[in-house]
């Protein structure tokens, strides 16, 4: 992000959203290659809104008249109005309903952001349905499309920390219903890619972060409120949400048949202990650390993606400084903890 002046402190959600949606020069260049419309499926989640606006800003900077269509059930009409204010067309659609899908316009370029995680242990059937039936419906509806599909790093088992994170060739043998449903989602995309020749890129995300949610927010909030920070899951990867969205959009260029998978996260393996101690220093608190680091953790090695599209731009230190200030100033949080401490796959 060296071409942008980053603020020392982010005071408001408007300032945060402006930073989150700044496109990289690489995205501005790439966006010119996308044929209209760019179809964004499942924009109602934590990442979708800023991804949509980032795509719009990239097209505007490129001087390129790209039509962007954001698709969601849109139970939140405020979100719908916000996207439309950025000249993003919105369509209400339930991707579990084939008839609703048939009403969507044709598109060659598709970003797939649909998923269901939390509450899996209470309602596993819903998780399996959303994570398998929806991608099957989309692949049947757009057999000639080019799809960048958001997946999850949780499809890997815990791996030895000393190895530096799972590579994309690691066997997919995770624990828990949610993680296995994510494996099934990838297999559905692979199956239809083989059946129809649909080019697909599978983006395995490890912990997107901004100031209102994310693994760094979870740790910082625990430190600030003197809650214990469990060190058992002692190491993690993370990535600034803006960088993740930038790479997801650009990953359309990596779509192939059969699909190729890419770990989507920052380059570092970070110690939870060191993160907690740094937040304690930044916020004038004492970190209440409990437990001891296990030899394994949920980690991914992003070298394959970085070699093709470059490393994420946002430094860890900048994210931590912003988050510490945000929490001290009582900035709004989404109240959606990542549960990064979970080691048995039960979300």
Q: What does each of the following model-derived ranges do?
A:
Residues 1-39, 61, 335-347:
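Non-catalytic terminal and boundary segments that flank Rossmann-like NAD(P)-dependent oxidoreductase
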Residues 37, 109-112, 117, 133-177:
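Conserved Rossmann-fold NAD(P)-dependent oxidoreductase catalytic core, especially the SDR/UDP-sugar
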Residues 39-57:
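N-terminal Rossmann NAD(P)H-binding glycine-rich loop of SDR-like oxidoreductase domains
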Residues 49, 74-78, 82-130:
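NAD(P)H-binding glycine-rich loop region in Rossmannoid oxidoreductase-like domains
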Residues 60-78:
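Conserved glycine-rich Rossmann-like NAD(P)H-binding loop of the short-chain dehydrogenase/reductase
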Residues 123, 128-135, 148, 181-182:
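Short alpha-helix in the Rossmann-fold core of NAD(P)-dependent oxidoreductases
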Residues 175, 183-237, 241-243, 279:
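NAD(P)-dependent short-chain dehydrogenase/reductase
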Residues 227, 231-234, 239-347:
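C-terminal substrate-binding subdomain of Rossmann-fold SDR/epimerase-dehydratase oxidoreductases
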